[in-house]
Amino acid sequence: MTKRLFQVLMLCLLMPMVALAQSWDANLYKQIEQSIRVPQFADKTYLITKYGAKTDATAAKYQKAIQKAIDLCSKKGGGKVIVPAGYKFLTGAIQLKSGVNLEVQEGAVLEFAFEPELYPIVETSWEGLECFNLSPCVYAFKAKDIAITGKGTIDGGGSNDT
């Protein structure tokens, strides 16, 4: 008897919640869908090796060089930041900025180092909650017209130990 009463009470409590649940908004969906567009980029290129990414640098130096190229590219109206073929670049977190297309060319490897100090605290979300956390490998905040392209390899640097 008590089990049956409990079930009826739970049903009575849950019914209003179902009625109040947010329904699918087809108009909102269409509005979001229509706002999506192909990013636009200026026809300029920035080769990361021209900004200090030498083939024998540390992860911190590669990170600074890559970020310098990204920052300059965005500041000058956007374009393509190129990670050149034939090299492996060990780096820390990279923050994309508006107007930047990060192209990892075929034969290039962009590998993220397991060095926590190379991943600054950034504003992010986790399971829908706004929070501050260590930066992901590639991060962008309030940026428009960004992309990662190319046939190269992006290696998150994960292992059985991380």
Can you annotate each of these PLM segments?
Residues 2-7, 12, 19-101, 105-162:
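Extracellular "leader-to-stem" segments immediately downstream of a signal peptide or signal-anchor
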